[in-house]
């Protein structure tokens, strides 16, 4: 099956989104963070995938020596290189879309455009986990996508906090 990489900055909800897209049960939340790379085999609607869940980029670094930050950056670059070589498709998870997210996404997009990969687009997933109603969702979409990129269109929305019985948010 295809290899799908789930990328993004630290603490954006990559594993949370992955769990909801695939019905997986990987540990996620504020008390848990993915270390390095996590591989998961899933079947979604009859299609097999290998999911690469990555440690978020730009995570805080415990300073133990003068080289702590440099070593962390080198580790992140190595992991990104491995992911780039292995993955067929790339999901980039953002929540509040910041200029750092934009720079990260721009770098990934440029690398893909300059590669020989057959699918050279990044699928951006807006993890609006703090959004509690549809009005706020439309505001966030307008201010963080349409106002910035002009023609952004909402393709699909899944609110993870929706109660399945009452359908209330």
Language-model features: locations:
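Conserved GTPase G-domain substructure that encodes guanine base recognition and part of the catalytic core
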Residues: 1-169
């Amino acid at each position: 099956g295809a290899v799908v990489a789930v990328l993004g900055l630290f603490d954006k909800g990559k594993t949370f989104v992955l769990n909801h897209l695939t019905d997986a049960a990987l540990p996620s939340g504020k008390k848990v963070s993915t270390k390095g790379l996590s591989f998961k085999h899933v079947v979604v609607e009859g299609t097999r995938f290998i999911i690469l869940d990555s440690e978020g980029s730009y995570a805080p670094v415990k300073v133990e020596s003068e080289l702590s930050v440099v070593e962390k950056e080198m580790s992140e670059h190595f992991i990104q290189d491995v992911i780039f070589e292995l993955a067929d498709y790339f999901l980039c998870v953002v929540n509040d879309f910041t200029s750092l997210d934009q720079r990260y996404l721009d770098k990934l997009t440029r690398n893909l455009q300059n590669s020989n990969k057959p699918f050279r687009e990044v699928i951006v997933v807006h993890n609006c986990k703090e959004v509690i109603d549809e009005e706020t969702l439309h505001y966030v979409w307008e201010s963080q996508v349409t106002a910035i990129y002009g023609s952004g269109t909402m393709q699909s929305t899944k609110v993870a906090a929706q109660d399945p019985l009452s359908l209330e948010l």
